[in-house]
Amino acid sequence: MRFSIRRFFSAASGGAIILLLSALLGLLLSNSFLSESYFKVLHLKMPFSALDDAPNLAEFISIAPMSLFFFVVIAEIKEEIISGHLASFRRVILPLISALGGMMIPACLYGLITSGHLEVSRGWAIPIATDAAFTLPIILALGRHVSEGARVWLMALAIFDDLLGIVVIALFYASHLNGYALFAAGLITAVMIGLNKKSVQNLWVYASAGVVLWWALLVSGLHPTIAGVITGLALPSVADQPEKASPLERGKQIIAPWVTWLILPLFGFVSMGMSLSAMSFHVLLAPVPLGVALGLFLGKPIGVFGATIMATRLKIATLPKGTSLRMLFGLSLLCGIGFTISLFIAELAFSGSDFLVPAKYGILMGSLLSALAGWLWLRFLKFPAKGV
């Protein structure tokens, strides 16, 4: 790994503060005397004449700049698998199993709570994600209360969570498909794979192909953020000269600061825009917000911790060094902080629907409860170095 874990967490901490402040600003403006102007700007239609239903500004931010976010995510995953903390099966298996458990149980819990309401079934994936941008800085602030091995486990789990979230978006949140555009997207992808096989090092060739791919995917009906994923996978991870950085590393170095300091805060500012005037216990106990909130606050830790216990008891994997099950339970509580990806999936599932704002209520409620419970558990309980 090119950077220390502490440096990685420190960068995440600074970005999380800006993201949180931006989200709070969006929430404040949407509940102030400026709310009408705020929502009017967000609903401005973008000039995409090739599309029957052109996206508004808020939707455009979710499909264009966020493509760069997914590029950075897949670049991180690729680097970790090739030469980082996910480079061996032994290191991969426990966080992968934990992430799968943390995906299935929240989705099932949401489905159970919303059963009988088919119109909200598309929201099943909202509580499956863990937001590393908020989770990692919290455990950095906890310092010695969380072992280095546990931090690495959580980082790997968050990476797999993002990867699984990308797969879910690609498979379950496509709109009506355009065969010609889909064929064009497949052709561009094949060209990019060919460039990789030829070890073409020119970063801008891939960037240009990625932009065309993004447009083809947008027209095709598949979610265009997948273009960021494909571009990240296509970029060579090895340079043609030892003293040079690889195209993948150069691309990440260029884009990552923009994602951290501009794109994610902009997304938070736009996505957290919702009126709180309708919030009440009656509204919060409706199927959608309750399903999302409990999916995050209960489903996430049950799924993550349950899968971790199963993997260790069956001797499929071992606990990280210096880590106990009680410590991992506290971290499992923090996994219920779902913000960026949860909001993103909520926008996909309920765009233009009356269920979007209640879903955001659920994300806010579940994430706050998870953060508070995880912090208190890890801050005030004492953990042995081994055992439970």
UniProtKB/Swiss-Prot annotation:
It comes from the Bacteria. Keywords: Antiport, Cell inner membrane, Cell membrane, Ion transport, Membrane, Sodium, Sodium transport, Transmembrane, Transmembrane helix, Transport. The keyword Transmembrane helix applies. It is found in: Cell inner membrane. The keyword Thylakoid does not apply. The chain crosses the membrane at residues 8-28, 57-77, 93-113, 123-143, 152-172, 175-195, 210-230, 254-274, 278-298, 328-348, 361-381. GO terms for cellular component: plasma membrane. Disulfide bonds: none annotated. One of its GO terms (molecular function) is sodium:proton antiporter activity. It is a multi-pass membrane protein. One of its GO terms (biological process) is regulation of pH. It holds the Pfam family Na_H_antiport_1. It catalyses: Na(+)(in) + 2 H(+)(out) = Na(+)(out) + 2 H(+)(in). Gene3D superfamilies: Na+/H+ antiporter like domain. Na(+)/H(+) antiporter that extrudes sodium in exchange for external protons. Belongs to the NhaA Na(+)/H(+) (TC 2.A.33) antiporter family. This is Na(+)/H(+) antiporter NhaA. The gene is nhaA.
